[in-house]
């Protein structure tokens, strides 16, 4: 453990925005410390998509969790083979009688954006962070990962949602009202129901406790087998309590409002300019951090400029897109500079229909819906038809789309389910994909069946007032390598099947914004059909339901708004039944906590029903990008869940770009 400086070296707000201007400058802490990489190594990369936030306690998106992954340590972590090991906790114990995990913490410090020690990390920092996540005002996207598993968390969070509704005069779409009396009791009055009252719930009722500075306990709602894996994810990270209290919703909006206790600290962040993380010499494991400075430089044309800068040796990594891959591999000067990213097995891709193409006001989110030019009313009628959706399910050839990013071996990435193989197994060691009705799912692509479903849907759609061709708006993020090309081959392939003999659909490809794409497009309902992805947060099939499940009246994870379309009354009949049966199946599966086999079968049956009713169309696993990189990613942390794969701890910056043969040797040697 590095020698500790005295704790409390700076007040909570000494580095707050507007109070200190030196953050991000030269840091005395980065020039010396407990360990050095020996070569003063740096790692520079371009980025072309602006994160909407750096707040690791509230975000859930890929780019925005980089700071949480690299600058804040977790209780446990993983090695490069996926084996769990000590993190901020040196040991932990489970008491099945009280459903309580106890963690014993090591000595560690918080540092500011200059690398200067602020205070020691204590168990209270985990408590304060969890309270922040459970505060409705901050709209934490991962709050469900806390309310589902920590005793008392759901009651606490729900009460404060109702209290906020009462204080702000919220009236739900169905007419439900909220009032609060002088003692804090909230009354919720729904139409045709007796009023329900909710007494105040203090945070002391939530099952997280700082027993002392170095002892932390979590009390669970049930014996949840995936809890330890959940700890290596955003909502269970610590945060310095006094900083949270001072900054509130401005926490982690800049380098100045972010404290770090991980392998790196956030030294500078300027929107649309630069993003710098430096090695944290105070970290307990600094000897295993081999990069001194990580610099991300904003460049709106990174996909074009990055490879050219690689040729000049100006940056350390760039994605080699499919449009230039062949030329790089055939050129003697670049062929040995091309390798691949490490496969990320926890991400899967699938297509979502927009079941709520109109504007809608949730209590904590506004959806604009599809633009009029894409005929949202026509689309709403179309997706209410099961045969229409099944024509997509059976008509899409995922091999064609996957081949854009994986010219060789693309079938290795194809999936017919949402959950990937080898994700988890039941108590008998049976892979989850072999449980329940998932065991019966096979390849869907079948042109003849697709046309049968199309032909069956045409008279039904015509009777419902649908006009042809049906406009299918399909957006993509221009900052995502090859997504535009995938959309183009998708359009050509599916229209080639479904428009054979009838002008059935018109897939309209649109470019979304590079910045805040998810908030502007998917979460805003501005699409008809969209390629989406999901990364598992922990090792239990419940995590794979997050993109699809919505509680009554809730916004959910803002993917397809399945339940909202039913609640708003334009998703009806068989489709509404399929949606609500899925929601009920998930609610029942969640309640099975004493029989893992029964639990997994229940979730598997629900996932199978989601797919077989064509409420979602599976696509495949994440295809690793072709890269020119100086990093050996096989040295880095790995896990099939959470954000471990984003951590750069343990990775060296080499003096050359890695070739494919070296990549394969590194993979085999890990």
Stretches found by the model and what they are:
Residues 46-96, 259:
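N-terminal lobe/hinge region of extracytoplasmic solute-binding protein
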Residues 85, 278, 379-498, 605, ...:
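Append "and occasionally in soluble cytosolic enzymes with long acidic Gly/Pro-rich linkers
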Residues 90-172, 178, 217, 306-312, ...:
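Aromatic- and charge-enriched surface segment that lines or borders ligand/interaction sites
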Residues 113, 271, 443-448, 452-537, ...:
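Ligand/substrate-recognition segments at binding pockets and active sites
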Residues 123-128, 213-219, 263, 292-293, ...:
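Alpha-helical secondary-structure segments
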Residues 173, 181-205, 213-214, 219-295, ...:
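Gly/Pro-rich hinge or "lid" segments in bacterial periplasmic/extracellular proteins
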Residues 267-278, 295-368, 404-405:
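Extracellular/periplasmic solute-recognition and catalytic clefts
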Residues 549-550, 626-670:
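Long beta-strand-rich cores associated with HINT superfamily self-processing modules
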